[in-house]
Amino acid sequence: MKLFKILFAALIAYVPTAWSAVDYNIKYSSNYLMPAYVHFKADGSQYSVNAKINIPLYNIVFTSRGSQTASQFKMVNYQDVRNGKPYAISKISPTTIEYGKVKNGLETEPLTLPTFDLFTMAFQLSYYDKLPTSFQITNGKKIQKVLLYQAR
C-alpha cells in the first residue's frame, strides 16, 4: 500500500508538467500574398509567442513571453518590432506596467489586472479554454481594460 501511495504521488506530481509542454508553429496565408507565421511555446513554467508578418518591403515581428501557472499565462514582456527596429514595448513587473512607443518614451501605471497581448490572449484561450473575468490587452502602445460578462 505504501508503494502505491508513493507511485500515485509521483504520478500526480508529473502529470501537470507532462501535459503542459506544447510547441506549435502556424503559417497563415492570405489572398494578399502576405504570409504570417506564429510560434506558440509553453513548457509548464514559461511561455513565449513569436509572430512574424511579412508585408512586402516591411517586416513586423511581435514577441511575448512570460511565466505559466496552472490557470493562466502571466506576460512579463511584449515587443512590436518593425523592420528590425523596436516600435512599441510593454514591460510588466509584479506591481507596474511600462508601455508605449519607443520613440515617445514609456508610460508607467500600477498593474491591477492580468495583461495579455492579442497573441497571448489567443494562446490563453486555446490552451486553458478560459480567460480571466477581467484583464487588460496591450499592443505595446496602449492598454485597454476588458471585462467579460458571464451568462447566468
Range-by-range predicted roles:
Residues 2, 22-25, 48-51, 73-74, ...:
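Short secondary-structure boundary micro-motifs
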Residues 85, 89-152:
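Solvent-exposed helix/loop surface patches that form functional interfaces
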Residues 2, 28, 55-57, 97-99, ...:
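Hydrophobic transmembrane signal anchors and adjacent membrane-proximal interface regions, especially
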Residues 17-63, 68-71, 78-94:
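N-terminal cleavable signal peptides for secretion/export
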Residues 10-18:
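Hydrophobic h-region of N-terminal signal peptides that target proteins for export
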Residues 2-9:
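Sec-dependent signal peptide recognition
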